[in-house]
Amino acid sequence: MALTRGRLSNVTAIAGAANANVVTVANNKKVYVKSIAIHDGGAATGTACTAYVYVVPNGGSAGNANRMFNVALTAKETVLIEPAYPIILEDTGDTINVAAVGGTINVLVNGDKEV
């Protein structure tokens, strides 16, 4: 199995009270999420907010049952989530979904994917 390493998503801006799929498996090619960078990218004065990261199986939806991380961010803070073992997405349609509450966040996901 050959892998490509690097960025799994572009920087994705997610506004308060919204969520977005930032990585989605295509053609049953496994995706290995090694890190998720989240930045509180709100207004120039900054606003504290919360980011939620979900691992959603194909056909599912983001919710308490698949929430993996709950990150409280102060104004203009950046956090890096690096699990000890990669999060593995295996089936077409499996996603990493990220939500923002109370402000705007920017998200970047890095890792490996099958080619």
Where do the protein language model's features map onto the residues?
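C-terminal interaction-tip segments
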Residues: M1-V31, P57-G59, T92, A99-V115
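Long, low-complexity N-terminal extensions
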Residues: S9, A51, F69-V71, L108
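Asparagine-centered strand-capping/turn motif at beta-strand->loop junctions
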Residues: V23-N27, I38-G46
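Short beta-strand/loop motifs in extracellular/secreted proteins, especially
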Residues: K34, G46-A51, G103-V107
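Hydrophobic beta-strand positions in extracellular immunoglobulin-like domains
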Residues: A37-I38, G111
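Short, surface-exposed beta-strand/strand-loop-strand elements in extracellular ectodomains
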Residues: A43-F69
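Intrinsically disordered, low-complexity Pro/Gly/Ser/Thr-rich segments with frequent PxxP/GP/PP motifs
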Residues: G59-T92
